[in-house]
Amino acid sequence: MMRLFDYHRSSAAYRVRIALNLKGIAYESIPVNLLEGEQKEEEYRSRNPQGLVPMLEVDGRRLTQSLAIIDYLESVAPEPPLLPRDPADRAQVLALALTVTCDIHPLNNLRVLKYLSGPLELDQAAPSIAARN
């Protein structure tokens, strides 16, 4: 059975849970509490050196990054399809997904926000300012 290491408030992990459930794939959810720093503990880092969620374990292999995991799920369980079959339509969907994961998500990511307000000593308005530019 697949094992999904995730955090309930992680939008990246949520994307993978949606894909797994839409495809009807059974999986075991292994919570990783990001607020308590469980992703930084040796036990988790030994499995996933990135220390991020989600991570999907399948037959001893560890997959990371939500869009890569979703692409894997689409390949091994093509029905029902999550992505259009037409290459141009598929490219448009991927462009939208990449906009969310690369442009929007980082500005709302807890790890990024802590870094901005911690080591960089930026105020809480910094993400809003960055989003407008």
Please annotate each region the language model reported.
Residues 1-127:
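GST-like domain detector, emphasizing the conserved glutathione-binding G-site
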